[in-house]
Amino acid sequence: MKSFGLCLFILVSSPCLLQANLSSDYYTKTCPEFEETLVQIVTDKQIAAPTTAVGTLRLFFHDCMVDGCDASILVASTPRKTSERDADINRSLPGDAFDVITRIKTAVELKCPNIVSCSDILVGATRSLISMVGGPRVNVKFGRKDSLVSDMNRVEGKLARPNMTMDHIISIFESSGLTVQEMVALVGAHTIGFSHCKEFASRIFNKSDQNGPVEMNPKYAAELRKLCANYTNDEQMSAFNDVFTPGKFDNMYYKNLKHGYGLLQSDHAIAFDNRTRSLVDLYAEDETAFFDAFAKAMEKVSEKNVKTGKLGEVRRRCDQYNDYKG
């Protein structure tokens, strides 16, 4: 299985918001069937491959948190240039997520060629899939252009990892213009995620503590050790971030943290740090508060550092620039 641990992939670049020319009805006249087509394709794909929702949400974060929502993550590497897609942290991005974007783009190009950007497709698909698995409706606007650059060297240092300290994680969020409250809400996406064993093996196979970390439920730790016993020989071995309702977008992730079911080191940190604990408690008790905060934070992320006008293009193929010569 591919890793779907969302791991707080956070932007370090300028926090300014560029919302120029974005609107909810951007394609009403130029491609009126866009949203209907998108919803039908994501519905069919999610039914056929239930991990599509979490995979696409992860793809959204890995795109938008590195220089904005500009579909740079979709560009394939060439002999001359290694793209973001092949950065170390992106190599486990799920094929189903790329596939659903390609399917939507192909269908939309047949109806209205050279109109709808790949970045708008990714944002729209993520919104629809979150709702499909029980999550809140995220208000999104359209009008983004696709990036003219995708460079793997721009990724490192902009995406946080699960073994980082809370100080480090918070500083990354703050550098991107996101508050601690928004950070805690966005991490709730772990409610439908799962992670490779290698991402939490150091917690459960600690030689100094045979029963697992003291903050982890001992029975949970024991089950994880069984599941991941062969992880060094099978890199695809994974565990759900939310062991109780892994396919449903709800507030169970936060409830789990309060009872020792946090999978990643960053999960434990966010549950007990003085700066974040009260928010974890709030979202564990009040799912409506979590949904509202998550939707607003997602909307903010989706509109950060948007490319418009000559800063981008509408790609004919999401994995290639329009001037690609081979």
Curated annotation (Swiss-Prot):
Task: Tell me the Gene Ontology biological-process terms attached to this UniProt entry.
Answer: hydrogen peroxide catabolic process; response to oxidative stress
- Residues of the active site are 62
Provide the leader sequence positions.
1-20
**What binding details are noted for the cofactor?**
Binds 1 heme b (iron(II)-protoporphyrin IX) group per subunit.
User: In its keyword annotation, does this UniProt entry include Protein transport?
Assistant: no
Sites carrying sugar chains:
21, 163, 206, 230, 274
Binding-site list for Ca(2+) 2: 191, 242, 245, 250
Q: Kind of enzyme, top EC level?
A: oxidoreductase
Site for Transition state stabilizer, residues: 58
Q: Which domain of life is it from?
A: Eukaryota
Q: Which residues are recorded as binding heme b?
A: 190
Function, in words: Removal of H(2)O(2), oxidation of toxic reductants, biosynthesis and degradation of lignin, suberization, auxin catabolism, response to environmental stresses such as wounding, pathogen attack and oxidative stress. These functions might be dependent on each isozyme/isoform in each plant tissue.
Cited PANTHER family: PEROXIDASE 6, PTHR31517
Can you name this protein? Peroxidase 6
